[in-house]
């Protein structure tokens, strides 16, 4: 009987089991060759070896599948691709790039669009959706044995059968066949065939499209660093190599699809929110005067990785005192001072989805009278906003009704300073408390503000906030809202927000209590 090389690791185990299974045991004659091992057993041992071989092969396949996502069934990816087929028609194709492979020893993270359509997390892959015959093909590079030996399993075109089983695509082809296959679609001979591909920049890791576009704009403004985006280069290549195709933007369709989350997506976002909440609670417990902002970051990251996150969904915003006044303060280099508030806005990248939760609390563990009045206003505003969220309404309608409630809330209320009263009155006029979608990116694609009708499956943040420029004081909390069939659910409601709950959590022991670390102030730029 001939046994291929992948059984080598269990030869010894098999012989031991055979020895126990038979009274008379003869040491097998093993002849080593460069690529295979020939083992001759007596006939009565054959069936036992065959059974064990099948078990081992099953284990190997299970290990290979470990490198593929387990959050979504094949049917969900197929349904997403079917929606694209329905929209582009039979005289068009859609072509989607994966993220490129990463240099050095960085961990690869797939682009959100590519992952959304097939779940595959390998670089330099292409997904072709042929509207003419409604078939789907994945194009992948060939196996790099040296890289696999160093890094572990990497799915390649040689794993075609496994990839078809995992993703539900019709075919898996070598990447060098893509050009000929575009011709082979037969559409080029037709009348004005269309090729759809995303024009918008691909999000990976802790990126959001709006921030990527800001980065592109800054680079374009630099006469020494003007860059062409990867998407623009891809579109240019398509136009040069296949001028017969009219190239159109697939991003608007993908954005509308991603705006409405499935039940499975909401499950993953819920888990990401739970991890974010636990991380913020750990940061609360680790807070005391003299602790550095970066130590709260470390406490939160510990919770992220402890619960299986692959990193952060966006850079942590942790600002003590006046640092919080900067809405996206990322440096985290200052010490936390007695009497100040500290704001944390942070969530993980969990299975390619994230969350967006913010809390603010007193460094010394107790809100003073001035802080209490302003903070309770923010709590009341959050409650008023959630009160009116339901299917069929709009953000503008929610904002109008909540603002009316807050005008009533202020009747009879007093604040310590005129600047504080002015801030809360301006807060009622501010239209940004109803914020942005959240999903695969923290500032996810699609729109929920203005006159967009809310639908079940939309996930976004409710983020009431006020600024007091005279004191460089900024106060806000942020929660995760998901529209249900009957109303709304606050996914982050469990994260302490009531004053008594926040103060109680701060008093609990945290990481910096039982695992003290020397605070090394970072050098400021």
What are the roles of these predicted feature ranges?
Residues 41-42, 60-525:
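Active-site neighborhoods and metal-handling regions in enzymes and metal-associated proteins
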Residues 49-57:
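Bacterial N-terminal signal peptides
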